[in-house]
Amino acid sequence: GSDSTALAYTMHELRQSGDVGPVALLHVNHKLRGQDAEDDAEFCRQLAEALTFPFFCCEVDVATEAALAHENAEAQGRRERYAAAREALDSLCMHEAVPLAEGRIVTAHTADDRVENFYMRSIVGTGPGGFRSMLYRNGNVVRPLLDCTRSDLRSFVRGLAETEGATVVLDERGNLWREDATNAHT
């Protein structure tokens, strides 16, 4: 989506300026959306190639895994994404000779996600610590975009596309990012 695409471009800028070490891009195909999911993976591959990031891609049949675990697909998908991110981080750190303790999993969570998370926990119910806000850093997971709105990030990507000489990738329809229709309700 636009959040992850903006994060990729931001990490590229930080990598180019030497402010961060090696960066890779990960895409997890949950096998829930047929050809759209395949097109998402291809867009991510092209984005990683354009930004000269190593690309990690995996496929997980989240619906089947969720049924086996007696879990909802969204929670199972989250677990699978973080498991894949840990594996990608291990691989990148080993390949780049960077101590794993220095590696980070960087996610594109935004201010919008923070609000959505609060309301979801309110509806579902939660324990005493459940209303804590998303953390900027939790172990090796970093969320640098928590103060940015989705609208901010879309404006950033659109602005980048208008910048002469900027590296920008378009999907097969000419869009600056891919939209997951299953997220339209949030």
Label every model-predicted segment:
Residues 2-186:
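Core alpha/beta nucleotide-donor-binding catalytic domains of modification enzymes
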